[in-house]
């Protein structure tokens, strides 16, 4: 059995094992009953990437065994969305006859959406020319005539050619609200669309009786900011990655949300700004007056490394802390500080990555 095969019959068992494992990790903390949010058992990943293998006239997708590093052919990938699986064979068959499009092609990346859009990135070990552009536009039109809503990117060293967009538009349903998100190629997006919707609904439910303003660190493309905006008077959100900030600004505008402001700076710099250690010109340039905000709640979704101690101490200054974590081990380390002043009142497991050891957790903490 290759790693492309899924044991869908064993899905619930692996989820139960994760739930037990995460409860064991946090057994030293007083936690409420664990809320468990399942994933679809297959076709849950909204993105996938494959190496391309050239064998005579043949061309096909391959993956590599993580332990032996041996390659194996992949014609279908049940973990990926149905949209990706539908496109995979048609794309490779369209590439095969064209020497221009297949020459030194070494990788294909897919980014799909629940809304029906899909973006394909073709990576090459050669520079791309006008002939490639002509051919790729023909291929794109051919596949869109088959019913796809497809855009394509060609990449080579220090080179990027876009036909016609380098992003997809996703639509996520959060209770009775439909939110629109711009998701840019090579920027972080939640990999599991169905579970992402459940995470947003959980966050909205946790904060439905809020007052005052919300501060959010590590906001990405505004994924949570937009969903939570209706529960607060204002939202002030920080993000360091420039493409994510640009997407967040687009998402705020397209959803007609007028109470969210995004500031491009790191969580560590923002901590210094909040403490008054130094002034930041970018805050002044964006007319952000930190003293005007009345933030009782803070939302954090840090990278796998978690928050540093200084950020944890800053976060402790808020009445309520909502923490989404992709690494329970660093969440545990942070909770050893946060639990000195706050108690855990909600505790959730989101199965973003079925059949792997990875676990996504959510906790709501309230001041003791």
From Swiss-Prot:
Active site: 326 (nucleophile), 360 (proton acceptor)
GO biological process: tRNA methylation
Cysteine-cysteine disulfides: none
An annotated Gene Ontology molecular function: tRNA (uracil(54)-C5)-methyltransferase activity, S-adenosyl methionine-dependent
InterPro entries the record matches: MeTrfase_TrmA_AS, MeTrfase_TrmA_CS, SAM-dependent_MTases_sf, TrmA_MeTrfase, U5_MeTrfase_fam
Catalysis performed (reactions): uridine(54) in tRNA + S-adenosyl-L-methionine = 5-methyluridine(54) in tRNA + S-adenosyl-L-homocysteine + H(+); uridine(341) in tmRNA + S-adenosyl-L-methionine = 5-methyluridine(341) in tmRNA + S-adenosyl-L-homocysteine + H(+)
Positions annotated to bind S-adenosyl-L-methionine: 190, 218, 223, 239, 301
Pfam families: tRNA_U5-meth_tr
Transmembrane segments: none
Entry annotated with the keyword S-adenosyl-L-methionine: yes
GO cellular component: cytosol
EC number: 2.1.1.-, 2.1.1.35
UniProt KW keywords: Methyltransferase, S-adenosyl-L-methionine, Transferase, tRNA processing
Summary of the function given for this chain in its UniProt record: Dual-specificity methyltransferase that catalyzes the formation of 5-methyluridine at position 54 (m5U54) in all tRNAs, and that of position 341 (m5U341) in tmRNA (transfer-mRNA).
Family to which this protein belongs: Belongs to the class I-like SAM-binding methyltransferase superfamily. RNA M5U methyltransferase family. TrmA subfamily.
NCBIfam families named in the record: trmA_only
Protein name: tRNA/tmRNA (uracil-C(5))-methyltransferase
Record organism: Photobacterium profundum (strain SS9)
The encoding gene: trmA
């Amino acid at each position: 059995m290759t790693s492309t095969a899924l044991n869908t019959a064993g899905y619930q068992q692996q989820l139960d094992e994760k739930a037990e494992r995460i409860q064991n990790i946090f057994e030293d903390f007083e936690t409420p009953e664990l809320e468990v949010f399942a994933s679809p058992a297959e076709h849950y990943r909204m993105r996938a990437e494959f190496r391309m293998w050239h064998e005579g006239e043949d061309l096909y997708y391959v993956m590599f065994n993580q332990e032996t590093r041996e390659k194996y052919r992949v014609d279908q990938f049940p973990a990926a969305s149905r949209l990706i699986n539908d496109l995979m064979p048609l794309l490779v068959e369209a590439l095969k006859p064209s020497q221009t499009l297949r020459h030194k092609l070494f990788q294909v990346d897919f980014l799909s959406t629940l809304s029906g859009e899909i973006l394909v990135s073709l990576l090459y070990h050669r520079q791309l020319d006008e002939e490639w552009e002509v051919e790729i536009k023909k291929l794109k039109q051919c596949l869109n005539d088959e019913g796809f809503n497809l855009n394509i990117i060609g990449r080579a060293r220090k080179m990027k050619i876009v036909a016609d967009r380098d992003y997809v538009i996703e639509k996520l349903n959060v209770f009775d609200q439909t939110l629109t998100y711009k998701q840019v190629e090579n920027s972080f997006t939640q990999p599991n669309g169905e579970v992402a919707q459940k995470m947003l609904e959980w966050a909205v439910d946790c904060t439905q009786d809020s007052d005052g303003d919300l501060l959010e660190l590590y906001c990405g493309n505004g994924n949570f900011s937009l969903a939570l905006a209706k529960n607060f008077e204002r939202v002030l959100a920080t993000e360091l990655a420039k493409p994510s900030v640009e997407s967040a600004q687009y998402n705020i505008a397209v959803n007609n949300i007028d109470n969210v402001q995004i500031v491009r700076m790191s969580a560590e710099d923002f901590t210094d700004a909040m403490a008054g250690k130094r002034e930041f010109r970018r805050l002044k340039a964006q007319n952000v007056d930190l003293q005007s905000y009345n933030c009782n709640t803070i939302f954090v979704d840090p990278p796998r490394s978690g928050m540093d101690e200084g950020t944890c101490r800053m976060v402790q200054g808020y009445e309520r802390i909502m923490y989404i974590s992709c690494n329970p081990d660093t969440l545990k380390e942070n909770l050893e500080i946060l639990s000195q002043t706050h108690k855990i009142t909600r505790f959730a497991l989101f199965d973003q990555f079925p059949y792997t050891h990875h676990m996504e957790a959510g906790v709501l903490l309230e001041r003791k």
